[in-house]
């Protein structure tokens, strides 16, 4: 971990934290409490950061939201409902981001403390502030998927080892959060009426103990997988509908901007001409050779000439003759029985093939003589 180094510019920024205003996003106020657990540090940080620049947003707590109503301006019920839904979405997003950053800081604090055992708590907090600032920038830029992937162009302020550790910790935190989400979702399906009904039936037929517990979680997991599958289908349908609506709007705009003319030129849409011959290769086999065309024609002709009819049923005297053929000895001549069999059955090609196959299974000597 000794290679886990900050550059000279980053160390300089840490030394200027007390006099220089850092740029944080709206979610960073929840992380300052995680980095420093004392109210004294928060008060000193607030005193040191006057927020004189209007463009820098001041950290806003979710408990300090006020709605101002006057006689002249009142929100309608519909707009209030929309605002409430937007606030709920923002709160959910803020909660997810805060949970991610809290877990990230907890793990990263241990790694930084291990890499710099001689640094005091204030210096460690300064390093964590710089690291979390970069992570928040990535979240604001591309979401959590951006954080979980490797950075396209690492910052010059951090070393390559530090960046690798940051993305490793981020992936670990995202995986843990996904496991927690699935675990909480699993609890809902374990207590669902369908799963409870199946467990009740299993208990009635004598299933108890660990087996019943395993079956209960198995049924809940299957139900959760089905629900996620149908949710993905719903999302795909909504996406397709939005694409169709956008295409319809674009088509209407084009029709509105279209100016009809007396002479309309007809245009033929065709694929561009390809130069040279097409080459088809399947598993390294060159199929563009003309011999494969001839072979395909022969196979097609053979399929047309093939007789796909079923053989005639062998009954009565014909069946007795067939039994005599199967009971022939090695020195017996089957020609007389074959002539009688052919006279009774009037066989086709399929019947002869069926006879040969039956003799091959029942009498090998007669099969060889008939085949010859």
From Swiss-Prot:
Disulfide bonds: none annotated. GO terms for cellular component: mitochondrion; ribonucleoprotein complex; ribosome. Its main location: mitochondrion. Disruption phenotype: Failure of fusion of the polar nuclei during megagametogenesis. Keywords: Developmental protein, Karyogamy, Mitochondrion, Ribonucleoprotein, Ribosomal protein, Transit peptide. The keyword 4Fe-4S does not apply. Residues 1-28 form a transit peptide. Residues 248-257 have a biased composition (Acidic residues). Coiled coil: none annotated. The keyword Mitochondrion applies. Residues 240-265 are annotated as: Disordered. GO terms for biological process: karyogamy; polar nucleus fusion. It is found in: Mitochondrion. Required for karyogamy during female gametophyte development, when the two polar nuclei fuse to form the diploid central cell nucleus. Component of the mitochondrial ribosome small subunit. This is Small ribosomal subunit protein mS77 (rPPR2).
